[in-house]
């Protein structure tokens, strides 16, 4: 333990379920996961963050109060994990904090992205150097600012799986794919991951998600609704591209439901699951693909995993745990790794993925 450089990663995504925290070392050929934890959002914070992500406007006090509450939860997650793992904070070189995205608009005339999280407060409450604000440098360089995890996906998997794709199914689904023949990598958001399924579960079944895909499995795919949703222009955009809750949200779902004859609640959920599966599979280049590794909450949706396998005959579809990375903490590990890259003054983006003008060192450093 004393010889290892340990980095922490904090990730809270568009699913708004809570904070994933990982402690990791990257000195070996494969990353070493030292400890992990999940800290759920209290209901009031979840409500505030959802409101900030979808509302057309809000008061500054709402924004900054929510940011402070969120940051204190981040600090609590770090401090509690260090205590439970019996690791002294002096051993942690830095925390890579993604923050909570409330807006991501890289394609407008004045492009921007906004992640809540006060790195100064986090450094103060943990006594650990914090690396934050990873996305804006890539946007400043003409990129999408997302996805950033592909560099980490390649780092941990490419040498073992030369013709492979990774899909992170959080609120939004994003793909990383590389092939030995093309000697190139692509990465992009391909559409909704769990975000619409979770929204419908909350509205129709009063639960936060479809555990294991058990409800969707009892429904039938409504092809009229599916085709209506697939008319969304985002799906036909060429990569690189990125999206978020500002597009795929409850209002988007309701607008599509209104264009379709009445559909049973379970059939709607089955159709939303199929939408995620089809838009992922249609975004992949299957010519040389041998493996699809799934991370994020979607890896636990067995019905969704079956639908992915159904659309990808001859391709092995597995959770990233089969490759040695816990699917629940892949993204937190990625931001711990990006923090390491920043401290080492190494680039963290892949221009072919984000469309940036070149490689850039990402993030800002907030010393302990």
Curated annotation (Swiss-Prot):
ATP binds at residues 13-20. Pfam families: AnmK. InterPro entries: Anhydro_N_Ac-Mur_kinase, ATPase_NBD. CDD domains: ASKHA_NBD_ANMK (cd24050). The keyword ATP-binding applies. Pathway: Amino-sugar metabolism; 1,6-anhydro-N-acetylmuramate degradation; Cell wall biogenesis; peptidoglycan recycling. GO terms for molecular function: ATP binding; kinase activity; phosphotransferase activity, alcohol group as acceptor. It comes from the Bacteria. Keywords: ATP-binding, Carbohydrate metabolism, Kinase, Nucleotide-binding, Transferase. It catalyses: 1,6-anhydro-N-acetyl-beta-muramate + ATP + H2O = N-acetyl-D-muramate 6-phosphate + ADP + H(+). One of its GO terms (biological process) is peptidoglycan turnover. Its EC number is 2.7.1.170. Catalyzes the specific phosphorylation of 1,6-anhydro-N-acetylmuramic acid (anhMurNAc) with the simultaneous cleavage of the 1,6-anhydro ring, generating MurNAc-6-P. Is required for the utilization of anhMurNAc either imported from the medium or derived from its own cell wall murein, and thus plays a role in cell wall recycling. NCBIfam families: PRK09585.1-3 (NF007139). PANTHER family: ANHYDRO-N-ACETYLMURAMIC ACID KINASE. Belongs to the anhydro-N-acetylmuramic acid kinase family. This is Anhydro-N-acetylmuramic acid kinase. It comes from Hahella chejuensis (strain KCTC 2396).
């Amino acid at each position: 333990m004393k010889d290892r450089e340990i980095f922490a990663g904090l990730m809270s995504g568009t699913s708004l379920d809570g904070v994933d925290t990982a402690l990791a070392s990257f000195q070996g050929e494969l990353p070493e996961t030292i400890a992990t934890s999940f800290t759920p959002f209290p209901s009031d914070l979840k409500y505030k963050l959802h409101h900030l992500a979808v509302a057309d406007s809000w008061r500054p006090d709402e924004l900054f109060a929510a940011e402070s509450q969120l940051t204190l939860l981040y600090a609590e997650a770090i401090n509690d994990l260090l205590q439970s793992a019996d690791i002294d904070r002096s051993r942690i070189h830095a925390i890579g904090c993604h923050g909570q995205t409330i807006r991501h608009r890289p394609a407008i005339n004045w492009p921007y992205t906004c992640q809540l999280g006060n790195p100064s407060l986090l450094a103060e409450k943990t006594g650990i150097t914090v690396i934050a604000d990873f996305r804006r440098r890539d946007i400043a360089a003409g990129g999408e600012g997302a996805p950033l995890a592909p560099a980490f996906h390649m780092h941990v998997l490419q040498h073992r799986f030369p013709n492979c794709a990774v899909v992170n199914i959080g609120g939004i689904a994003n793909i990383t794919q590389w092939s030995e023949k093309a000697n190139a990598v692509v990465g992009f958001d391909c559409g909704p991951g769990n975000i619409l399924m979770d929204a419908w579960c909350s509205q129709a079944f009063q639960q936060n998600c479809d555990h294991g895909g058990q409800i969707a499995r009892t429904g039938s795919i409504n092809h009229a609704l599916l085709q209506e949703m697939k008319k969304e222009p985002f799906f036909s955009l060429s990569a690189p591209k990125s999206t978020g809750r500002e597009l795929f949200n409850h209002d988007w779902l309701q607008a599509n439901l209104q264009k379709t004859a009445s559909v049973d609640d379970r059939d709607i959920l089955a159709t939303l699951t199929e939408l995620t599966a089809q838009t992922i599979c249609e975004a992949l280049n299957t010519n040389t693909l041998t493996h699809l590794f799934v991370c994020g909450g979607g890896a636990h949706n067995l019905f969704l995993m079956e639908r992915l396998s159904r659309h990808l005959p001859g391709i092995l579809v597995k959770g990233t745990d089969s490759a040695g990375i816990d699917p629940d903490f892949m993204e937190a590990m990625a931001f711990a790794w990006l923090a390491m890259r920043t401290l080492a003054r190494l680039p963290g983006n892949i221009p072919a993925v984000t469309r940036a003008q070149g490689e850039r060192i990402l993030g800002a450093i907030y010393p302990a």
